[in-house]
């Protein structure tokens, strides 16, 4: 079966916003809410939309923001321009613009602010702090015609996984495999949605795995699922290297069609600011 995914292209814009509140969802996860007039037309229609978030230089605290030149982002030629890609967790209109929720994982901080500028900023973020967000460039909807949705995600992919659940039709069966650092992250899974409603994961059948228990658990959990149905769609995202065997199993052993599977390496251990558009497995690109 071929799934249709609606797609929309957006005009790229760099938007300034300021922190209005923060909420620690778990010891290692913080929700940062930004607001501003420039967010009023921010598009965020798809479950896995992503935008570039520009942070202050960790050495100086100065924000070296990009500017738009002929429809393209141009970073400043002087100063350090720091950016990372994030999925917008939620966007809400306000009387004078909009609010944007971002959920940031505080990992890599043991090596200092220079090694983890986004996490270090998020850990200390306070009301009035300024950021610049650019994008998303496009949005793709939930595939039409699916009857079962299987999601595999670590902490970095949970905002997108939550959006998948929220946007999937109510008659779609949702199965989730979560690859979590440890049991402290359970608080993030169970946290209320940004609008104050229940956690979207309450709707799904959720298996929680903990990396402290050893490697290989995600692949084993995926192999235990019955994925034979033609109306099943599988989306997986997280640390790139750990997802390579998952993708190989889904695409080659099971033989699921390209249109039925998406596996996205949001980050890669030992690599700074990995471009998630790069092939997950360079030896076997789609």
Predicted regions and their residues:
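Extended, composition-driven regions rather than compact fold-specific motifs
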Residues: 1-286
């Amino acid at each position: 079966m071929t799934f249709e995914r609606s797609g929309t292209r957006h005009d790229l814009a760099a938007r300034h916003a300021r922190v209005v509140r923060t909420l620690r969802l778990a010891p290692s996860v913080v929700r940062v809410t930004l607001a501003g007039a420039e967010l009023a037309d921010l598009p965020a229609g798809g479950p896995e939309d992503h935008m570039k978030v520009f942070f202050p230089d960790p050495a100086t605290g100065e924000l070296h923001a990009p500017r738009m030149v002929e429809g393209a982002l141009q970073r400043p030629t002087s100063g350090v321009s720091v950016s990372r890609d994030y999925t917008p967790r939620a966007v809400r209109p306000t009387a004078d613009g909009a609010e944007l929720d971002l959920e940031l994982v505080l990992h890599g901080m043991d090596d200092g602010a220079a090694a983890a500028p986004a996490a270090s900023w998020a850990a200390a973020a306070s009301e009035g702090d300024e950021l610049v967000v650019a994008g998303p460039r496009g949005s793709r909807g939930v595939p039409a015609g699916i009857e079962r949705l299987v999601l595999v995600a670590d902490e970095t992919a949970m905002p997108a996984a939550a959006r998948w659940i929220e946007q999937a039709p109510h008659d779609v069966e949702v199965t989730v495999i979560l690859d979590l650092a440890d049991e402290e992250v359970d608080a993030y899974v169970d946290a209320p949605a940004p609008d104050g409603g229940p956690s979207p994961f309450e709707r799904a059948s959720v298996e929680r795995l903990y990396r402290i228990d050893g490697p290989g658990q995600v692949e084993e959990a995926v192999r235990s699922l019955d994925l034979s149905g033609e109306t099943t769609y599988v989306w997986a995202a997280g640390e790139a290297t750990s997802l390579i065997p998952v993708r190989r199993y889904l695409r080659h052993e099971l033989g699921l069609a390209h249109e039925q599977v998406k596996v996205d390496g949001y980050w890669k251990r030992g690599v700074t600011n990995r471009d998630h558009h790069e092939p997950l497995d360079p030896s076997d690109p789609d």
